Design a protein with these regions (language model features):
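A conserved regulatory-domain signal marking ACT and ACT-like small-molecule sensing domains
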Residues: 1-148
């Protein structure tokens, strides 16, 4: 006979309220690539004209961002020659910035800190550091910056 199971009551524990940076990670040796799309009415086929050849070449992309007129992403700088070759062969107009880094700040409950990304931007822009892109999640904020 199965034992009756009691419902578990959720409760807050101390670490859920604690804040503070757990780690700061710098991933250097990256390149930021921005590929042009014909415009807001281009549709999925134009985006796939950029993404499909890269996928077929098994090139790993980070920070993929899709906008009506462009796709941008980050690749390892060592993969940039192959990315250039693939996009040139596909007839895609693009720009690439070498010497980038992805900086990630990891902290619990980061999403509940109002204005955090704005403060990070102020610090980076205040030091004349070029910022290509910023992204956040529940427990981290990452930015792609010019490192050199």
């Amino acid at each position: 006979m199965a034992e009756r199971m009691r419902p578990i009551r959720a409760r807050r524990v101390g670490f859920e309220r604690e804040r503070g940076v757990l780690s700061l990670e710098a991933d250097t040796g990256r390149s930021f690539v921005s590929a042009e799309l014909p415009g807001p009415d281009a549709g999925v086929s134009e985006a796939l004209r950029v993404l499909s050849p890269l996928a077929e070449s098994q090139l790993p992309l980070q920070f993929l961002r899709a906008c009506p007129d462009c796709l941008s992403f980050v690749v390892a700088q060592s993969d940039l020659p192959q990315v250039r070759e693939v996009l040139d062969r596909a007839g895609v107009s693009f720009e690439a910035s070498e010497g980038c880094a992805v900086i990630t700040v990891v902290a619990p409950n980061m999403r509940s800190i109002p204005g955090l990304m704005a403060r990070m931007g102020e610090v980076l822009f205040g030091r004349a550091i070029g910022v290509y892109q910023m992204a956040d999640s529940h427990s981290s904020v990452s930015c792609v910056i010019a490192a050199g």
